[in-house]
Amino acid sequence: MDWQQLHLQCAKQDVDLAESLLLEEGALSISLEDAGDQPLFEPLPGQSPLWDEVILTGLFTADTAQDIESMAQTLAAQVNARRVWTTALADTDWEREWMSHYVPIECTNNLWIVPKWMTPPNPDAVNIMMDPGLAFGTGYHATTRLCLDWLTDQDLSDKVIIDYGCGSGILGIAALLLGAKQVYSVDIDPQAVLATKQNAERNDVTHALEVYLPEDFAKAFAAGDIPKADIITANILAKPLMELAPYLATLIKPKGGIVLAGLISEQLEDMVRAYEPWFNLDTRHSYEKSDDHDDSHWHRLSGTFTG
């Protein structure tokens, strides 16, 4: 079965009305995307910021084809749309289409990230088998790669790691495969907790990885059930990272290592200032430009606990 798509470009204050009207007309799903080139870097937990100009796309069954043009004009007038247009969408195997976008990634020092349905290109490498669809941290984003590259340069033998803001669990899993003794993963999102557990099982590291929501982690740490870390990884965003600085300082051993990511160039100075009472940080590492993407605006900070 083929499909019809109706696209509306409108201001963000009209998005709620546009969504309601599309649903009333029988839209099976609605997607939102940026109508321009406006980045949204800092969504905090519970926030859902929108771009100033938004393109809404409603998906309809093919039997709406004869009515969709008139529907488009009516809806455009109701929501003051800047633009309105329709497109046909051929039916396809969406699961296979989604899977086709993921390929194995080679990181530094013989570390690979491999989608769970694929065979590792190098069976002798350190291969992390991941489900890219569960939570943030698939290895395809520059911030994750920056942390992974840092981990491969560390001596992780017999080390205890705390991965704060674990997402998919990829950093903790990588640490264990690279020789760490124990990982404690933490995330505010229950879906990330589930994803981490599933990915840990997929990589046979469940015996050495525990995952918590923040409040449960804090209780276990206060009770002495979780030791201080040799290394802390935190790939989040600038605002929560700055707020976490004094807390993370309580979780780490003397001279322990830390790596922070999810940062852009303009945020580095404030981040160093937030952490300098406890950590000596190196600001020199940004993601290198590749043939496909320029992600050089993403940076990591790494250093040593001095408090």
UniProtKB/Swiss-Prot annotation:
Methylates ribosomal protein L11. It is found in: Cytoplasm. The lineage of its organism: Bacteria, Pseudomonadati, Pseudomonadota, Gammaproteobacteria, Moraxellales. This is Ribosomal protein L11 methyltransferase. GO terms for biological process: methylation. GO terms for molecular function: protein-lysine N-methyltransferase activity. Pfam families: PrmA. Belongs to the methyltransferase superfamily. PrmA family. GO terms for cellular component: cytosol.
